[in-house]
Regions:
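Polar low-complexity intrinsically disordered regions
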Residues: 1-2, 61, 128
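N-terminal secretory targeting modules
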Residues: 1-45, 55, 91-96, 135, ...
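Mixed-charge, polar/low-complexity N-terminal
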Residues: 2-3, 36, 41-42, 73-75, ...
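Residues at the starts of beta-strands that form the adenosine-phosphate
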Residues: 13, 60, 139-141
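Conserved SGNH/GDSL esterase-like catalytic core that processes O-acyl groups on lipids
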Residues: 15, 24-120, 124
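Residue-level preference for alpha-helix termini and adjacent loops
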Residues: 20, 70-71, 204, 209
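Residue-level detector of flexible, active-site-proximal loop/helix-junction positions
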Residues: 21, 67-70, 148, 192
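Alpha-helical cap/lid subdomain in secreted, periplasmic
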Residues: 82-235
Length: 235
């Protein structure tokens, strides 16, 4: 049961951008990930955290998440998260809250340096996205990290494994860029208690070693809701 101590976001317009972790209309493909032993099928959608965060906070949700997409245009053609964010055609000028969920689906890109503004690197595109939102809207802007991308029982995904260590380097870069721009980074992958030893070995919170189950989405939403209660709309 969510304790509704924070009412400041009730009725406010939330524009959310991101991957399949955010997109609550996605029907995962058969090759989205590997089911755990005993699982016969995948849920018909993902992005559960966005549904529950909107419910907990009383937000008017405008969901522009897109499964399989990232912020680096070279990897995602014309319809990238960046192209969805860097336009006012969707009405975001009236948004009270804008969140951009990042990292999944950009792993093949070059990370780059945190001071980079290039179209070719992850850091460069994140810098451009944040500058655009701060210059063109009066919304409260936050960057979200929802997952470490794959919760696999193999040793590469162990907390000390090479995959996790790579993700940590990317998360560190995101957090530093957010500090540079004066916006928060809410890192659910690091802080929502959905780590390897809780979710990597069974199916309660993650159903295909990638996407959160509905229960996992609720846990992540509660984490983000806790963060949201500590800040207020700018207008």
């Amino acid at each position: 049961m969510i304790n509704e101590i924070g009412q400041q976001w009730r009725g406010k317009k939330w524009y959310c951008y991101g991957t399949s972790m955010t997109d609550n209309s996605v029907r995962p493909g058969r090759n989205a990930g590997q089911l755990f032993d005993g699982q016969k099928s995948s849920p018909d959608r993902t992005g559960f955290y966005s549904q529950y965060l909107a419910e907990y906070a009383g937000l008017e949700e405008h969901n522009f998440g897109k499964g399989g997409k990232g912020i680096v245009p070279a990897l995602h053609k014309e319809d990238s998260i960046k192209s969805r964010v860097m336009t006012l055609a969707d009405g975001k000028a009236e948004a009270d809250l804008i969140t951009v969920e990042v990292i999944p689906n950009d792993a093949k890109a070059e990370l780059g340096e945190i001071t980079d503004w290039s179209d070719d690197t992850f850091c460069g595109n994140l810098n451009q996205i944040l500058a655009y939102l701060l210059e063109n809207t009066q919304a409260f802007v936050a960057v979200l990290i929802a997952t470490r991308s794959r919760y696999n029982p193999g040793k590469r995904h162990h907390p000390a494994g090479e995959i996790t260590q790579k993700r940590l380097r990317w998360e560190d870069a995101v957090e530093k860029i957010c500090r540079m721009h004066g916006v928060p980074c809410w890192n659910g992958a690091a802080e929502a208690n959905l780590g390897f030893f809780r979710v990597g070995l069974e199916q309660k919170y993650v159903y295909d070693q990638i996407h959160l189950t509905e229960e996992g989405g609720r846990v992540l939403a509660k984490y983000f809701w806790g963060k949201l209660q500590t800040v207020y709309p700018l207008r």
